[in-house]
Amino acid sequence: MTAFHTIAVPHEDILAGRLTLDVFAADLWEVHKGRAPDEYLDPVRFFQKTYQTEGLANLLAVVEKRLQGAGGDPVIQVQTPFGGGKTHALIAMYHKAAEWDARRAVVVGTPMAPTDTIWGLFAEQLTGSRAGFEGLTAPGREALRDLLSAHQPLLILMDEVLEYATKAAGVPVGSSTLAAQTLAFLQELTEAVATLDRTCLVVTLPSSVLEHYDEGAERLFRQLQKVAGRVEKIYTP
C-alpha cells in the first residue's frame, strides 16, 4: 500500500514544523482589519491552502452572479455546525469580492461592544462617517436602502450575529432594547437587499444554539432565524 504522504504531499510549513495552532483560528474581522496571519490575509496564499469543496465553489459562483447583477440569491445564510468552515467561507468571499471590484461591508459580532450598532458600522465602512446612522434606533429601510444603493456592487458579510445580539439585549433603548432594534434592522436589511440587484448579504448562524448560551440567547437565536429565513437561501460550504 502506498504511504498517504506520498499521494497527499503536506505543505512546506507543515514539513518544516512552522505551523502553529493559531493559524487554524480563522477570523473575518482580523482579515478585514489587516491583522490576520498571512495564511488568511494574503489572498494568493489563502486560496493556495484552501481546498475548494463543491459547496464553497457553488457559494462563490452564486455570490459573483449576484454582484454582477445577473440574478442569484440576494440573502444567503451560511449554516454549519461549530468548526464547519463558515468563517473560512466568509473569508473566501471577502477576498473574491476584491477580484470582482465589489465594495465590502463586514460585521463580526464577537469584537463589537454592546452599545455599538450594525448600522453604524455599515455607514462608517461605506462612507467614512456615521452621519445619519449614529443612534441606537434602527434607521428604517429607505435610509438603509439609499446607503447600500450608492455603493453597489456590494457584498455584506455578517458573522457571529447571535453573539452580538446577546450582548445588545442588555442595552435599553426607550422601552425596547438594542437587541430588539437589531432584529428590526435585520428585517429592514434583508428587505432592502432584496430590492438591489447588485448587493448580496451573507449571514452566518450556527446550525443549533450552542450550549453555553442561556434561555434568552436561545429566544434571540429563534428570532434571528425567523427574520433571516423570510428571504434567504441556506448554503453549506
PLM regions with names:
Residues 95, 101-107, 112-132:
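Conserved NTP-binding/hydrolysis module of P-loop NTPases
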